[in-house]
Amino acid sequence: MKRCIFAIMAAMLLCGCSIKEEPDTLAVSFFDVGKADSFLMTCGGKNLLMDAGTAKDGKKVAKRLEDMGVESIDYLMITHFDRDHAGGAAQIIQDFDVKALLRPEYMKESDESAACMAAAEDRGVKVIIITSQTDIQLGSTKLVIHPADKVYENDASNNSSLVTEVFHGNNSLLFTGDIEKERIADIKYELNDAGYDFLKVPHHGKYETMLQEFFNWVGAQSAVITSSKKNPEEQETIQALEDAGVKDILLTRGGEITLQSDGRKLDFTQK
């Protein structure tokens, strides 16, 4: 039997064939922190925490990470410095060994941003300001991070959100922070791809008139909206997703969502 296996492998090599290595599993946990964002992305022993909810959410996110066995964080990405994304960052930096903090160039002045940067300085965290397209690798997952190429006159903080493409095997995911109509109109000129399998819907499901065109362009089959029962997504946004052919629309107000990619398909669970 061993001779047979070796013969098959030798034949494949002679024919110019190679045995394709399966990618590590990519997992993304969308924490239930209400109308706020905090996601843990893991692949190949590396991880990235995208946003940390509000200041009140900081301890909740930290406890959830501890329960998941997380001891250190390779990358803490703050998409933008609004309170519902950056508020819990100081707590995370204090509680975990954070290797690097990724942030946009535009930083809204607030108690949350000041606390985040003070904690990073106190703990000696490497701060990387994203001013141009930046690629990072989490195991077999490639992330392409896009900063805004200007400071927008309206909603400067939201529109300065770092937008991230995630590529894992044949799967592609798009995370959009809280971009608003001005950046949504520009986003297709920033990105390298057209057509994604998954979309993190911008700004907690707030409806904008150009969302229908944007959702059609993205072409996702599944989407997550971060919302709460007290502050739900707008129904017009749900309708626009459905009209764009999105089959699976998941809401964090229904509980924590876990996305898993094997490089070919995406699976979701919610608790």
Role assignments for model-derived ranges:
Residues 2-3, 13-271:
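Non-globular, low-confidence helical/coil segments that flank catalytic cores
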